[in-house]
Regions:
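Generic, well-ordered alpha-helical scaffold segments in large soluble proteins
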Residues: 42-47, 98, 102, 137, ...
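A helix-coil-helix interface module used to build multimeric assemblies
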Residues: 2-213, 220-232, 294, 307-309, ...
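Proline-centered turn/helix-capping motifs that create local helix->coil transitions or kinks
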Residues: 104-110, 198-199, 280-283, 318-322, ...
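Catalytic-core signal marking the mid-to-C-terminal active-site face
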Residues: 2-29, 65, 71, 293-445
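Active-site-adjacent "gating/activation" loops or surface patches in catalytic cores
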Residues: 223-247, 251
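Glycine-rich anion/phosphate-binding loop at the beta-strand->alpha-helix junction
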Residues: 193, 240, 246-332
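Short amphipathic alpha-helical segments with heptad-repeat character
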Residues: 135-143, 147-150, 154, 184-187, ...
Length: 445
């Protein structure tokens, strides 16, 4: 069976491939191999720039050609690495051998080949490649999509800034609010957590077999290898080196990133559920696309499926993100291998997250405001002005105002404009205060 969108086991690469293809250059097997090649090449170049005595004679004009090994890396190259791995049964060693083959193609580089992967362990490559892929995926794909969602919400918040709406707390009518303000709450929350995510450190482990640069020191004790590692990781990869590690990354900062994404996802779940409710309450209608079907049995239905799709995908994403954040920082002694297979899944929750963001955006762009229904609900819920009345009465030192309004409103009788105004007329306050109270409506409170 040929692997394609119909035969893929995961819906990320199957049904939703069109939405997640943007992540393939960061989290696919091909992408991981390319990132490994990139780190190996940049490390070799940095050794030449040091320079190690044996690399002083390396022609720096070849650096451009070396960088083309990863900048022009294609699927055929990745397939070659996989073929080598069938023999080595080791993915990172296969990358090293592939680069040596590429050196042979350039020619004249035989004396320098053993400085590929010099003094390193596999995790020096993996624990730089993976955070680098996350960094670039966030910058190139995730942040722009979240920004697009925030922008759409901000447009609605501005457009509907002065649209009054009945609030609901505990599912019951509460003091009126403005539709634009309620949407602005989500803009604020998302911006806050997006800033928090952007402020998370992207760190890398780079320090040899057990984090001590043992091999580097024994071969070249005259160099400050910690300073070298700091410079390489920051200048060549744009990451921050973890100063104290075992064989692998501590993963603490990566856990912070996963937790931050999970908080953003949780906010979007909250948003999805609220807009689902607003549609159910008929505050919004949905644009209908010719040919689409809402239910296989009920022809009249236009379901809020985009919000439901988003909520489901975010639930999956958050479960995996929580697992990653909890599992990765835990490893037996100086390392066990459990992080290796787990790290291969870092793209999965981001895949479900971008599916969700796109679904939420799709749902938002279908909205048609039903101001008539919002106005109707306000007209039918005059009891909500009770808070305003009792607060003004408190200002006027009126005796027991809260209790008076409670006695009026907590009955089974319907509260309307007439009921409220009749009550106001009975109050022992000045005519000016009565006029002030009479002017309050569910629409302007």
């Amino acid at each position: 069976m040929t692997l394609d969108t119909l035969t893929a086991v995961s819906p990320i690469d199957g049904r939703y491939r069109s939405k997640t293809e943007c992540l393939a250059d960061y989290f696919s097997e091909y992408a991981l191999i390319r990132y490994r090649v990139r780190v190996e090449i940049e490390y070799f170049i940095t050794l030449c720039e040091l320079p190690l005595p044996q690399l002083k004679s390396f022609d720096s004009s070849l650096f451009k050609r070396l960088r083309e090994i990863y900048s022009k890396f294609d699927e055929n190259d990745a397939a070659r690495v996989k073929d080598i791995e069938k023999i080595t049964n080791h993915d990172v060693k296969a990358v090293e051998y592939f680069i040596k083959e590429e050196f042979d193609k350039i020619g004249g580089l035989e004396p320098y080949k053993e400085f590929i992967h010099f003094g390193l362990t596999s995790q020096d490559i993996n624990n730089t490649s993976v955070p680098l892929s996350i960094k670039e995926a966030l910058e190139d794909v995730y942040y722009p999509q979240v920004d697009e969602l925030i922008s759409q919400l901000q447009d609605y918040a501005t457009e509907w800034e002065n649209v009054p709406m009945l609030a609901k707390t505990h599912g019951q009518p509460a003091s009126p609010t403005r539709l634009g303000k309620e949407i602005e709450v989500y803009v604020y929350r998302l911006n806050e957590q997006l800033t928090s995510l952007r402020n998370c450190k992207l760190t890398a482990k780079f320090g040899g077999a057990t984090g001590n640069y043992n091999a580097h020191h024994v071969a070249y004790p005259q160099y400050d290898w910690k300073a070298f590692g700091d410079r390489f990781v920051s200048e060549k990869l744009g990451l921050e080196r973890e100063l104290w590690t075992t064989q692998i990354s501590n993963y603490d900062h990566l856990g912070s990133i996963f937790d931050a994404i999970r908080r953003i996802n949780t906010i979007i779940i909250d948003l999805d559920r609220d807009f689902w409710m607003y549609i159910s309450m008929e505050y919004f209608k949905q644009k209908i696309k010719a040919g689409e079907v809402g239910s296989s049995a009920m022809p009249h239905k236009v379901n809020p499926i985009d919000y439901e799709n988003s909520e489901g995908n975010l639930g999956i994403a958050n479960a995996i993100l929580q697992f990653l954040a909890q599992k990765l920082p835990v490893s037996r002694l100086q390392r066990d291998l459990t992080d290796s297979t787990v790290l291969r899944n870092v793209g999965v929750p981001l895949g479900h997250s971008v599916i969700a963001i796109q679904s939420t955006l799709k749902g938002l762009r279908k909205l048609i405001l039903n101001e008539e229904k919002l106005s109707e609900d306000l007209d039918n819920t005059w009891a909500v002005v009770a808070e305003a009345i009792q607060t003004i009465l408190r200002r006027e030192a009126y005796p027991h105002p809260y209790e008076a309004l409670k006695a009026l409103t907590r009955t089974n009788k319907k509260m309307n404009e007439e009921t409220i105004h009749e009550f106001i007329k009975t109050l022992n306050v000045s005519d000016s205060v009565k006029a002030e109270l009479m002017a309050i409506t569910p629409h302007n409170y």
